[in-house]
């Protein structure tokens, strides 16, 4: 199971293509 866009990544890893925001602790698109 993985965390999708804008989902919390405190306990789960983000789904493929997303990164965990260190500030907000949710999954976002990687910065260009």
From Swiss-Prot:
GO terms for cellular component: extracellular region. Expressed by the venom gland. It is found in: Secreted. Keywords: Disulfide bond, Ion channel impairing toxin, Knottin, Secreted, Toxin. PROSITE patterns: HWTX_1. Disulfide bonds join 2-15, 9-20, 14-27. GO terms for molecular function: ion channel inhibitor activity; toxin activity. Its main location: secreted. Pfam families: Toxin_12 (PF07740). InterPro entries: Huwentoxin-1, Huwentoxin_CS1. The presence of a 'disulfide through disulfide knot' structurally defines this protein as a knottin. Ion channel inhibitor. Belongs to the neurotoxin 10 (Hwtx-1) family. 16 (Hntx-8) subfamily. This is U3-theraphotoxin-Hhn1r. It comes from Cyriopagopus hainanus (Chinese bird spider).
């Amino acid at each position: 199971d993985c965390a999708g866009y804008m989902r919390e990544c405190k306990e789960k890893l983000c789904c493929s293509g997303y990164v965990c925001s260190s500030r907000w602790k949710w999954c976002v698109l990687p910065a260009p």
